[in-house]
């Protein structure tokens, strides 16, 4: 007798879980690595990653689309997460990422003298000025989510993520608009992506440890 394969609905239900969405979000949030293959004209060491999304940059829509999709994946992941601190932090992180994308920079000050002059005399747009606020919110919520993950898992790698985020946060404040600021931010973004992957791993482990009567361990319980 032929064995009936899993239905499309069942497959979608298995994919619709926080761990999967967090993995996709981590990949999308790391889309800035495409600058290694694209002629962006920005400095890997001195330019901020957000400058890739600036209004005058040729590949801005590639990076903006990736950030928006990544934020949507975080929103989808938050629906089935546990832990109030983690859920709130992920929601704020997603919202701040969307705001960061919508309130994009007018230009890339790290490589454009005219842009720096416009910033000095205050002739940039409101979105350009508010971008720093949304960036701080993004970092703060990512740090809070990492702290929540560390509190839930008590694992050493979660502690490393928190420590790296805190360290790069301090260095970013010290090196604001200075040489090396871009490199510090890129280390910070890689750390955030690592935190998302660790969150996915923790989610899979928690799901695997759940055993519903009559179902094998690791299966998705009925809603």
What are these regions (language model features)?
Residues 1-7, 209-223:
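Short, intrinsically disordered terminal tails adjacent to the first/last structured region
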Residues 8-206:
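Hydrophobic, aromatic-enriched alpha-helical segments typical of multi-pass transmembrane helices
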């Amino acid at each position: 007798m032929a064995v009936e394969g899993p239905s499309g609905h069942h497959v979608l239900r298995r994919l619709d879980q926080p761990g999967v969405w967090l993995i996709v979000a981590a990949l999308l949030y790391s889309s800035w690595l495409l600058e290694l293959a694209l002629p962006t004209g920005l400095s890997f060491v001195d330019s901020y990653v957000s400058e890739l999304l600036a209004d005058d940059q040729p590949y801005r829509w590639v990076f903006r689309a990736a950030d928006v999709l990544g934020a949507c994946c975080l929103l989808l992941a938050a629906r089935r997460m546990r832990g109030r601190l983690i859920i709130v932090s992920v929601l704020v992180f997603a919202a701040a990422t969307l705001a960061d994308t919508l309130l994009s920079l007018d230009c890339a000050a790290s490589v454009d003298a005219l842009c720096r002059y416009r910033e000095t005399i205050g002739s940039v747009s409101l979105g350009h000025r508010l971008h720093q606020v949304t960036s701080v919110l993004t970092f703060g919520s990512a740090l809070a989510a990492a702290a929540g993950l560390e509190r839930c898992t008590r694992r050493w790698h979660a502690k490393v993520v928190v420590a790296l985020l805190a360290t790069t946060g301090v260095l970013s404040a010290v090196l604001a608009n200075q040489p090396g600021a871009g490199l510090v931010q890129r280390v910070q973004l890689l750390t955030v992506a690592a935190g998302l992957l660790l969150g996915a791993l923790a989610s899979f482990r928690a799901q695997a440890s759940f055993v519903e009567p009559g179902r094998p361990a690791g299966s998705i319980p009925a809603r």
